[in-house]
């Protein structure tokens, strides 16, 4: 596990990033962001896009983080389309339990999808994601999920 405050590519790894399983869940590392597999899969391919550093409000991020975010989102949507062909992609920024700036990315599906050795159903479709239906990934499934997006 990373040490809190560990320096990575120009930014700091914070407690929220660690809570979502970093470094085991790391898919991509950017200057201002990390893309992680969400250890509790609400829908197949659920991800976390977390800002590096200690910002706890979206407006506290440096201007460069917003610029980079456009590139990151384009890459996220591409890897999800290639790997899982979602019908929609939802982005939720809650930050009520985990305080640092981060987004939950939920690919949405009309039907079930196979992912990381599991068959997952989007229980909230066509409404909001059903966060209570999340399936915890074990370490083997996390490795498979990360590999699916590399």
Describe each region flagged by the PLM:
Residues 8-150:
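HIT superfamily nucleotide-processing domains
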């Amino acid at each position: 596990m990373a040490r809190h405050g560990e320096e990575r590519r120009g930014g700091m790894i914070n407690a929220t990033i660690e809570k979502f399983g970093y470094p085991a869940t790391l898919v991509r590392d950017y200057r201002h962001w990390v893309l992680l597999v969400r250890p509790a899969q609400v829908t197949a391919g659920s991800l976390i896009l977390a800002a590096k550093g200690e910002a706890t409000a979206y407006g506290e991020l440096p201007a460069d983080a917003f610029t980079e975010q456009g590139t990151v989102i384009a890459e996220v949507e591409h890897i999800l389309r290639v790997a899982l062909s979602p019908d929609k992609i939802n982005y939720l920024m809650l930050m009520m339990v985990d305080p640092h700036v981060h987004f939950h990315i939920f690919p949405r599906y009309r039907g079930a999808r196979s992912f990381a050795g599991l068959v997952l159903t989007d229980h909230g479709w066509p409404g909001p994601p059903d966060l209570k239906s999340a399936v915890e990934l074990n370490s083997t499934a996390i490795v498979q999920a990360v590999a699916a997006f590399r």
